Amino acid sequence: NIDPKKLMPHVKNTIERGKKVMASDYAKALAQLSEYRFKVDQIFSKFDYIISPTVAIPPHKCNERPNIIDGKIDISEISDHEMFNENNYDYSSWIFVLAQFTAPFNWSGNPAVSLPCGFTKSGLPIGLQLAGKKRSELSLFQASKAFEEIKPWHQNRPNI
């Protein structure tokens, strides 16, 4: 048993939202997930890897949602979608913004790895994601190793 008073607000919010999911909606989501996985498999029939940033924005302080990106862009300017409205903000929506490059492979079941590939102007690490075909973990590790041999960012550490 978990004491609800010890949970962070975003965890409580996620639990409450989960309680409202109907079985029929869950079944529909599973069917959509199956279709999605099929489409991702089709993409990987043409490509060995997909390369992307690991996350969509530079790192920010733990437990804080950045309002400004790189000192210039107000987060509200990214989209007028209601999930970005400050009054309607919830943690799961913000996590989706952060995980927009990683979530697709979490859903599809494809292996992916995040590799260090540089630092922000303020010295925080930036990640590059390399995703592969299902059951291609060995090939993905080999490609990751080759990248790290060419660009040994993994040997650098941010100043703390």
Regions found by a protein language model. Name each.
Residues N1-D41, I57, C62-P66, K72, ...:
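Short helix-loop capping/hinge segments that flank enzyme active sites or metal/cofactor-binding pockets
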Residues N1-K6, S79-F84, R135-E149:
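Short, basic, helix/turn surface patches
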